[in-house]
């Protein structure tokens, strides 16, 4: 080929585009990505929030650096290191029998660890002939490289700031209608066990994505001893389907009691927004959370 440098650059384009797509997919489904990281129990919830955004920003930066080709060696080694690191992690998941979505492409593309590991190996093979490409020349080269390193992180934090940065703002909202809750309790619409000592009651919808994510969050928080160990009671809004099997299997949560509430009463208590998680003592609400401030 007359221009071998062009051929080497072509082999950088696909990994660069895939890094950008992977980062965008994770950002779109960042709530699921956060909970996925948190579910391993290696990091605190707040650390998981920050780590998720650092991974996304790093992928954006690598994708941009690969395509811009202004510092090819740094971009190449960075991409290889990230793919190799992820591959070791995915290999461990595969060997441990994990077949869940590994969130490599967020929730847009469901890949299990084995499938994602194959994808990473293919990307590494594609990157091999891209080594040694000559950098493009442009004015203000150092400035562009700096911007590609800094802007992605700043943009991710602006578009999706970590929830723990905004707990005080979330705490000012009232996700539960306390009067409607008390009336439902007095009328026997809610289980009598709610007035017996400490209880955690979760107002969920079976198909609600954030209800499922909050359930997964509760599971990990309790495993770490960071959430109430009181009996866990689910109150689902009644719909055509009352089979909780899929919800329980997807989230891994175990309830001590499961109840259903008519839609009008359910929406009145939750102010039309769910999930709502209430901490009770003898029927009195002592703390209440939505998905965002649940910690």
Residues covered by each model-derived region:
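Functionalized membrane-embedded alpha-helices
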Residues: 7-28, 50-89
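Membrane-embedded alpha-helical segments of integral membrane proteins
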Residues: 84-133
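Typically the conserved alpha-helix immediately C-terminal to a functionally engaged Cys/Sec
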Residues: 210-226, 292
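Thiol-based oxidoreductase modules, predominantly thioredoxin-like and allied folds used
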Residues: 228-244, 253-263
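Thiol/disulfide oxidoreductase modules built on the thioredoxin-like
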Residues: 263-295
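Internal/C-terminal transmembrane anchor helices
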Residues: 137-164
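Short active-site neighborhood of thiol/selenol oxidoreductases, capturing the structured segment around
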Residues: 190-212, 218
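Thiol-/selenol-based redox modules, centered on thioredoxin-like
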Residues: 170-178, 223, 286-295
């Amino acid at each position: 080929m007359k221009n071998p440098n062009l051929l080497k650059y072509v082999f950088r384009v696909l990994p660069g585009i895939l890094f950008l797509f992977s980062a965008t997919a994770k950002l779109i489904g960042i709530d699921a990505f956060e909970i996925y990281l948190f579910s391993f129990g290696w990091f605190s919830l707040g650390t998981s929030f920050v780590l998720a955004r650092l991974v996304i920003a790093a992928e954006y930066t690598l994708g941009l650096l690969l395509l811009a080709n202004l510092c090819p060696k740094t971009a190449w080694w960075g991409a290889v290191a990230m793919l190799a690191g992820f591959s070791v992690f995915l290999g461990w998941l595969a060997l441990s029998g994990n077949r869940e979505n590994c969130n490599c492409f967020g929730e847009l593309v469901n890949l299990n660890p084995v499938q994602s590991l194959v994808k990473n190996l293919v990307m590494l093979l594609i990157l091999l002939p891209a080594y040694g490409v000559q950098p493009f020349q442009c004015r203000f080269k150092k400035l562009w490289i700096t911007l590609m390193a800094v802007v992605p992180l700043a943009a991710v934090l602006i578009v999706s700031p970590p929830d723990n940065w905004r707990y005080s703002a979330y705490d000012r909202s009232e996700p539960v209608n306390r009067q409607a809750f008390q009336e439902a309790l007095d009328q026997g619409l809610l289980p009598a066990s709610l007035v017996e000592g400490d209880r955690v009651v979760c107002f969920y919808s079976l198909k609600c994505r954030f209800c499922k994510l909050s359930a997964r969050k509760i599971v990990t928080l309790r495993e770490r001893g960071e959430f109430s160990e009181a009996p866990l009671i689910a109150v689902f809004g009644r719909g055509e389907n009352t089979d909780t099997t899929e919800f329980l299997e997807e989230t891994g949560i175990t309830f001590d009691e499961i109840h259903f509430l008519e839609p009008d009463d359910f929406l009145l208590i939750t102010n039309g927004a769910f999930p709502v998680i209430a901490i009770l003592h003898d029927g009195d609400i002592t703390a209440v959370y939505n998905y965002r401030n649940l910690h």
